[in-house]
């Protein structure tokens, strides 16, 4: 057995020197125990030491718990008499809980706005979802000047900033956020394998940052964050995660081309109160993010710009089948659209048929219960 000379011992890297010293002390202490199994004691102490060493000296690596993974969908008050999103949410729950080819091993939580009918909440629970009631975030709650919005905000659209509360759900390690107008075609549990973003960016090319102009000011500005305003250092925002699929138009190639702008209908995130507060502060000025043309989607694309401090992660484009065509149907993991609109010319009839088949299956499974 080779020996470690004093010179070699002293030349060890600092962390190895410290670790070796602590282990040596443990060994010497253990050997003087009377009537104890010193081998087992040593193994137990080394295991404990190893765990503590990882936690204290390798903060870049977080221990993820699959038991803290979940799907999550926002449910708002209806803006019309017909609450199509109620039925769509039930279909989503059924696909994740019971459908043979799409059911997940992870739970699904519905973020229901306070004020949603109690019977709807109870129905979601009977269907197999857990429900978290949240207070809405109105545009007036975070925006300084709502007159800078690009359009008149509909009653339902007005509630979409509430979706940002996904970042407050820190009881979970990862959340797959999914809109109710997405029809799941295949099991998508492997989306949770997407890793956190640990690598901190040291410098930015400011000329590549998102640009904007202020009202009554033609000067072109670039989005530049002041972390003092957030009350935290930049390093405290890592690791983070926002993974999504490039947004695409109705007429796109197969496979779709990458774009710098993502669709927020399906995202994988790591919840973070720091990022939640950061996003709200960015949201004060809609002129910085397309005049809030797409509400929370526009805001999140600014907060997680590819050229910023926290670039979003690209997912396989078929996790979120925006504007699905007939030719790409075999490839899709999900199809994204309001397929309950019978007579719509936006989508191939087969997708409307797929959605109504899923809806009928859900009703049959629950024996046509409606309340």
From Swiss-Prot:
Keyword terms, alphabetized: Membrane, Transmembrane, Transmembrane helix
**Recorded topology in the membrane:** Single-pass membrane protein
Gene Ontology BP annotations:
protein N-linked glycosylation; protein O-linked glycosylation
On whether Flavoprotein is a keyword of this UniProt record, the answer is no
- Whether Membrane counts among this entry's keywords is yes
**Where does it reside?**
Membrane
Which parts of the chain are coiled coil?
A: none
Pfam families per the record? Glyco_transf_8
The residues that cross the membrane are: 17-33
- MF GO annotations: alpha-1,3-galactosyltransferase activity; glycosyltransferase activity
| GO CC annotations, alphabetized | cytoplasm; Golgi apparatus; membrane
Tell me which InterPro entries the record gives: Glyco_trans_8, GNT1/Glycosyltrans_8, Nucleotide-diphossugar_trans
- Its family? To S.pombe SpBC4C3.08 and SpBC4C3.09.
**Name of the molecule in the record:** Uncharacterized protein C5H10.12c
